Amino acid sequence: MSTVTITDLARENVRNLTPYQSARRLGGNGDVWLNANEYPTAVEFQLTQQTLNRYPECQPKAVIENYAQYAGVKAEQVLVSRGADEGIELLIRAFCEPGKDAILYCPPTYGMYSVSAETIGVECRTVPTLKNWQLDLQGISDKLDGVKVVYVCSPNNPTGQLINPQDFRTLLELTRGKAIVVADEAYIEFCPQASLAGWLAEYPHLAILRTLSKAFALAGLRCGFTLANEEVINLLMKVIAPYPLSTPVADIAAQALSPQGIVAMRERVAQIIAEREYLMAALKEIPCVEQVFDSETNYILARFKASSAVFKSLWDQGIILRDQNKQPSLSGCLRITVGTREESQRVIDALRAEQV
């Protein structure tokens, strides 16, 4: 008699799935964490809501209204979720039939688009970006048949550059009546002029992902947003969990999105941008650094001589970066989160000491 294991009972696509390798999963014993694009220091909050015996609102009113005001959209155009990662998954669950429809994304880019689709059993199609990391619009057009959701990260993680807005418009015209286009704006606070939030009225099939994990310094809160037209939001509400945000999370998120919270966020952004420019200038003078790419974000992508050896050397010194070697077109590249001046100096000194 054959013995069926628990793993045998699992769905085939789950058995074959490679989970997303988050910065925390990759681990390390560092004291300079520059691998997850987090804000380097903690922001203090006091809980104002102490009553936890009742279930929270599905979409907490204060959070939704504060975010809508901040983003310049209507409250009906906002959905809050457990990080933008949940938003990625909700869009696939709402719009893609497993075994029939596909998503499309353009590597090198964020890894959760493919993981979310593969978990659900939805086909993934890729159209690598051009050499300048802009969209290959002809390649996308050729692969659009059967695609229901297109993900475009701008500014792009891990490359750090903005997608050309005219290319976004062309993509939105190509997909009109065919697919949802998702602009992942996780890092938009570092270049707010580039947001597509003002385009929602023009493009009913546009959705925008946002997060409190980066500029708002709340990665541990797990709070993200989807901005879209009301018809899209209503569909997402059908597939979201009944209580996605706990009461303490909603409490802190509402405070972070208050007028004072927004002012504090913008001060953090200014500080990070100044530190980014300092670190970029220093990296360009270091012998083991071959190229430093422009960035509109809170991280820097650079190409190194002997990047694997450099990565391990810094790892052994407790400086944890993100290795991007396995991403298409990123051989020799490491991604460095912009941290404090002290952390920048640790990186600079360690790289200057490298003999490669």
Swiss-Prot record:
Keywords: Amino-acid biosynthesis, Aminotransferase, Histidine biosynthesis, Pyridoxal phosphate, Transferase. Pfam families: Aminotran_1_2. Pathway: Amino-acid biosynthesis; L-histidine biosynthesis; L-histidine from 5-phospho-alpha-D-ribose 1-diphosphate: step 7/9. It is an enzyme of class 2 (transferase). Its cofactor is pyridoxal 5'-phosphate. The keyword Transmembrane does not apply. The modification N6-(pyridoxal phosphate)lysine is found at K214. CDD domains: AAT_like. One of its GO terms (biological process) is L-histidine biosynthetic process. Its EC number is 2.6.1.9. InterPro entries: Aminotrans_II_pyridoxalP_BS (IPR001917), Aminotransferase_I/II_large (IPR004839), HisP_aminotrans (IPR005861), PyrdxlP-dep_Trfase (IPR015424), PyrdxlP-dep_Trfase_major (IPR015421), PyrdxlP-dep_Trfase_small (IPR015422). GO terms for molecular function: histidinol-phosphate transaminase activity; pyridoxal phosphate binding. It catalyses: L-histidinol phosphate + 2-oxoglutarate = 3-(imidazol-4-yl)-2-oxopropyl phosphate + L-glutamate. Homodimer. HAMAP family: HisC_aminotrans_2 (MF_01023). Belongs to the class-II pyridoxal-phosphate-dependent aminotransferase family. Histidinol-phosphate aminotransferase subfamily. PANTHER family: HISTIDINOL-PHOSPHATE AMINOTRANSFERASE, HISTIDINOL-PHOSPHATE AMINOTRANSFERASE-RELATED. This is Histidinol-phosphate aminotransferase. It comes from Escherichia coli (strain SMS-3-5 / SECEC). The gene is hisC.
